[in-house]
């Protein structure tokens, strides 16, 4: 057992299980309200899956690959027919350095706020008691008045696949890839699968992307999904839609995937990225009268309370939206519920989505298909990045911004962006969308002055384009 500050007692006002974004948000909120708080983390360092296997490393890898692509496509550098080549193992070092920085920073949060850190696997013993099993096998028990379960999720591993084989990976173990594949199969074309397809293809690896649905990222606006499909095709990624695996053969020299349709695919290795499950199986929930669903998730009310009054849950372990940003907010709201009797805030209605493929995608609000189904009289304003001076200067002219707005009230209903820095660009429009009443209007972008040249100017161009469609 290791702790950031000396543990004053084995009893705490609150114990948070898990130090990912949800656990961190809850712990910080509770300690700032002067509660005696402990946080239990099963891994050797804080940060949770987001920091060590999920959001941070995958985005760091994506950034490194993007810079390689930029170097190789820039006429300033490639005029001598020289190009920069890196392997997956080469760029893992960049991800590791970012993870280390994030871990040190988050460790500092707990140190400054005198939050006790306990390292080990937590499981409930009875209503107000948890046992923590350390790496050396020793067991300590702790009691608390309140508990917050923030244990996150892990990749779904179906039976019949040998994930211990050196050629078979999930989205956690892929960060321990020991060889440099020339050809990879990625099963699952959701956000994680699509992001890794971009990363590997950017490194020159042949990618077969197997999608269990009829289109890529079907929750997106159709134009965004179509744009991603085109760019994947244009980059050389082979996408197989509407396919399900039957079984996987893993050999010393590669893998063969057999599909239910009768097709067979062969590659050096496979990344299985189809679904996630909540980390609740080792918590011994039955000891406190709780039961997770088939996906390992817990039900909570508006205050993030489970069916057991003094036990709360946040983050991936409660399902949608399963975003690091939302989990942190849920943790803060839970701290409010515990200290003030009620969560004073809740997640916003329109949570932005950021997908770090190459190119990037981000959206907030309604899609065209949703507005059409609801018979909302909307209009569309578009801006192509290739017409923006800043994009031309930066050589980032692939992409577009689309604003959906009500024809009569001019209220912004949805914003969809495809291209470099899309996840940053989206927040400009989101800020206006969140305004109340008449303040949410597409006319804002026409009546304000933007810096020039900027990518933000896409909003002015799209707004003018959309307003010119009205009659």
UniProtKB/Swiss-Prot annotation:
Subcellular location: Cytoplasm
Family: Belongs to the class-I pyridine nucleotide-disulfide oxidoreductase family.
InterPro entries in the cross-refs: Class-I_Pyr_Nuc-Dis_Oxidored (IPR050151), FAD/NAD-bd_sf (IPR036188), FAD/NAD-binding_dom (IPR023753), FAD/NAD-linked_Rdtase_dimer_sf (IPR016156), Pyr_nuc-diS_OxRdtase (IPR001100), Pyr_nucl-diS_OxRdtase_dimer (IPR004099), STH_gammaproteobact (IPR022962)
A single MF term (Gene Ontology): dihydrolipoyl dehydrogenase (NADH) activity
Main function: Conversion of NADPH, generated by peripheral catabolic pathways, to NADH, which can enter the respiratory chain for energy generation.
Record flagged with keyword NAD: yes
Catalytic reactions on record: NAD(+) + NADPH = NADH + NADP(+)
Protein name, as recorded: Soluble pyridine nucleotide transhydrogenase
Any single Gene Ontology cellular-component annotation: cytosol
Classification via Pfam families: Pyr_redox_2, Pyr_redox_dim
Signal peptide boundaries: none
Catalytic activity, EC: 1.6.1.1
Cofactor: FAD
Record's cofactor remark: Binds 1 FAD per subunit.
Biological processes, Gene Ontology terms: 2-oxoglutarate metabolic process; NADP metabolic process
List of residues binding FAD: 41-50
Entries under Gene3D superfamilies matching the protein: 3.30.390.30, FAD/NAD(P)-binding domain
Alphabetical list of SUPFAM superfamilies matching this protein: FAD/NAD(P)-binding domain, FAD/NAD-linked reductases, dimerisation (C-terminal) domain
Keywords: Cytoplasm, FAD, Flavoprotein, NAD, NADP, Oxidoreductase
EC category: oxidoreductase
The organism of origin for this protein: Aliivibrio fischeri (strain ATCC 700601 / ES114) (Vibrio fischeri)
């Amino acid at each position: 057992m290791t702790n950031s500050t000396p543990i004053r007692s084995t009893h705490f006002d609150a114990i948070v299980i898990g130090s990912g974004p949800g656990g961190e948000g809850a712990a910080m909120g509770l300690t700032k309200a002067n509660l005696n708080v402990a946080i239990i983390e099963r891994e050797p360092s804080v940060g949770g899956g987001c920091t060590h296997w999920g959001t941070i490393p995958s985005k760091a890898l994506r950034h490194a690959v993007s810079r390689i692509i930029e170097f190789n496509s820039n006429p300033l550098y490639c005029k001598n027919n020289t190009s920069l080549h890196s392997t997956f193992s080469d760029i893992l070092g960049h991800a590791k350095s970012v993870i280390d920085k994030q871990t040190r920073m988050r460790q500092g949060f707990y140190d400054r706020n005198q939050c006790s850190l306990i390292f080990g696997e937590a499981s409930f013993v009875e209503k107000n008691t948890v046992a923590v099993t350390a790496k050396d096998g020793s067991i300590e028990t702790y009691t608390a008045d309140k508990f917050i379960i923030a244990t996150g999720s892990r990749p779904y591993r179906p039976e019949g696949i040998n994930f211990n084989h050196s050629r078979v990976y999930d989205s956690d173990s892929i960060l321990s890839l020991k060889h440099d594949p020339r050809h990879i199969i990625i099963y699952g074309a959701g956000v994680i699968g699509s992001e890794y397809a971009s990363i590997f293809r950017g490194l020159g690896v042949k990618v077969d992307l197997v999608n269990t649905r009829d289109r890529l990222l079907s929750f997106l606006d159709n134009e965004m999904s179509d744009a991603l499909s085109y760019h994947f095709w244009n980059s050389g990624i082979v996408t197989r839609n509407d396919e399900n695996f039957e079984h996987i053969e893993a050999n010393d020299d590669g893998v063969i995937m057999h599909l239910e349709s009768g097709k067979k695919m062969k590659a050096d290795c496979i990344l299985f990225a189809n679904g996630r499950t909540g980390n609740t199986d080792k918590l011994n929930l039955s000891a406190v009268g709780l039961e997770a669903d088939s996906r390992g998730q817990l039900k909570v009310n508006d205050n993030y309370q489970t069916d057991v009054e003094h036990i709360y849950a946040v983050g991936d372990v409660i399902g949608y939206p399963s975003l690091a940003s939302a989990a942190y907010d849920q943790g803060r709201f839970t701290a409010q519920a515990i200290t003030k009797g009620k969560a004073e805030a809740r997640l916003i209605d329109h949570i932005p989505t950021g997908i770090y493929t190459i190119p990037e995608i981000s959206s907030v609000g309604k899609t065209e298909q949703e507005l059409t189904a609801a018979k909302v009289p909307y209009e569309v304003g578009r801006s192509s990045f290739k017409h923006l001076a800043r994009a031309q200067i930066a050589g980032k002219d692939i992409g577009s911004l689309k604003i959906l707005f009500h024809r009569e009230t001019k209220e912004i209903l949805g914003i969809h962006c495809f291209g470099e820095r899309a996840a940053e660009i989206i927040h400009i429009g989101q800020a206006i969308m969140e305004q109340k009443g008449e303040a949410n209007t597409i006319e804002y972008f026409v009546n304000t002055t933007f810096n020039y040249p900027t990518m933000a100017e896409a909003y002015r161009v799209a707004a003018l384009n959309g307003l010119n469609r009205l009659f």
